[in-house]
């Protein structure tokens, strides 16, 4: 059943989206429109405003991107939270924070706990402890008895050196506030530390020396490495109660070994074991969850046991893909706001949809994969602008060309220039890049 905000039998609800990342905000208008919401967007992303204008002027795009009542554009990113405090939040039935940066800014804002609770996807101050903090999350999960990898907190350089010296098993070293896999490093006891290995992964000593050169901000999280599949169990909660969820396995990632997923294998909820739903309900209470949660865990190869290691208190770009298996978040969210219904398990099989399906995210594929319809990508681009996809492909190719040009300059031009002339060229390049980033037509970043 598809629910729409213009259904005469239902009153529309109102939602406010707040965030810096246009990529993460993009999926919400369509999802919330189907759930019966009229949407306002408060953002510093100029591209969202540009796309919103194009949606309003194009009936096909408007239908595909849902109903956005207004976009409130903030010129300076640092003013986003301040702007949200000047809005009448009582007019909204749902407030959605779109990205980790906005979550951290709200947490750091000099406002009352009550105001933070009005904005953040938690229902009690207990939830503040883990927002934007990998260490805080590990401690909360441990205290609640939720299965999570063993961990220790590294508070200074001395403790970091001691960790490496006494290493007896592979450890994941994580910067406390980081995302996208960029702050995650493997310390593997199987490496010699000399870099001479069949794998590209450097040894523990090399990793530590590299990190010390980056002016690390302590504390760090040292976490047991679990071998197995990465599962996504992203869910929507209200007052700690599970409203809807999805179940998928990472099949491919981008940027780095621990980066965001580009291809996933989704399964109908009817195929999911009851212990997974029990885990999700326990997580809702442990996290004080009151909104979208991006939940990730490891399924250990040897035992099949699940270990939760990530719970970002915002949705991911995959938030609306469960609909391709009949597990539509929009239907469940509308049902909750109309009747208070939560997710009941076990979930009945939906014969109108496949039990499993492989789904890619178009903006994390290469242009060649998109052009050749790898993983049937065009089937899952119903809500995407073809012009936008073409622009992404052009930006991807241009970035690759620039990378080769930079390498050529470093190898073949720099040796022939005086240091002062080389620095002048670099300064000119930075000035051009900064100017381009300030223009309204800022490039889309992967």
For each predicted feature, which ranges?
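Phosphate-binding site of ATP-dependent enzymes
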Residues: 194-257, 267, 271-278, 298-299, ...
């Amino acid at each position: 059943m598809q629910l729409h905000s213009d259904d005469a039998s239902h009153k529309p609800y109102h939602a406010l989206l707040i965030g810096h990342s246009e990529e993460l905000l993009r999926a919400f208008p369509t999802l919330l429109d189907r759930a019966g919401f009229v949407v306002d967007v408060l953002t510093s992303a100029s591209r969202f405003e540009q796309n919103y204008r194009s949606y309003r002027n194009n009936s096909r795009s408007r239908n595909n991107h849902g109903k956005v009542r207004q976009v409130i554009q903030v010129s300076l990113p640092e003013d986003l939270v301040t702007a949200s405090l000047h809005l009448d939040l009582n007019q909204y039935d749902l407030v959605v924070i779109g990205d980790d940066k906005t979550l951290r800014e709200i947490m750091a804002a000099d406002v009352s706990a009550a105001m933070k609770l009005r904005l953040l996807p938690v229902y009690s101050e207990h939830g503040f402890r883990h927002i934007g903090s990998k260490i805080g999350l590990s401690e909360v999960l441990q205290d609640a008895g939720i299965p999570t990898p063993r961990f220790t907190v590294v508070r200074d350089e001395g403790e970091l050196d001691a960790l490496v010296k006494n290493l007896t098993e592979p450890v994941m070293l994580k910067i406390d506030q980081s995302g996208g896999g960029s702050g995650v490093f493997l310390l593997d006891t199987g490496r010699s530390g000399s870099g001479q290995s069949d794998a590209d992964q450097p040894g523990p000593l090399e990793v530590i020396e590299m990190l010390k050169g980056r002016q690390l901000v302590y504390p760090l999280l040292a976490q047991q490495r679990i071998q197995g599949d990465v599962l996504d169990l992203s869910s929507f909660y209200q007052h700690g109660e599970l409203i809807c969820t999805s179940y998928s396995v990472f099949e491919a990632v981008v940027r780095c070994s621990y980066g965001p997923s580009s291809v996933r294998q989704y399964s109908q909820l009817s195929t999911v074991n009851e212990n997974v739903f029990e885990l999700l309900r326990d997580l809702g209470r442990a996290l004080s969850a009151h909104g979208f949660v991006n939940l990730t865990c490891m399924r250990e190869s040897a035992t099949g046991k699940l270990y939760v290691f990530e719970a970002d208190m915002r949705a991911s770009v995959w938030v609306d893909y469960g609909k391709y298996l009949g597990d539509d978040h929009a239907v469940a969210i509308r049902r909750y706001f109309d009747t208070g219904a939560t997710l009941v398990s076990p979930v009945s099989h939906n014969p109108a949809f496949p039990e499993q399906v492989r789904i890619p995210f178009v903006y994390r594929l290469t242009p060649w994969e998109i052009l050749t319809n790898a993983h049937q990508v065009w089937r899952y681009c119903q809500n995407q602008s073809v012009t936008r996809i073409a622009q992404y492909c052009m930006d991807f190719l241009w970035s690759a060309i620039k990378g080769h040009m930079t390498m050529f300059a470093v190898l073949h031009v720099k040796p022939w220039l005086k240091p002062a002339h080389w620095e002048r060229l670099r300064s000119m390049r930075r000035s051009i890049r900064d100017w381009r980033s300030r223009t309204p037509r800022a490039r889309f970043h992967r």
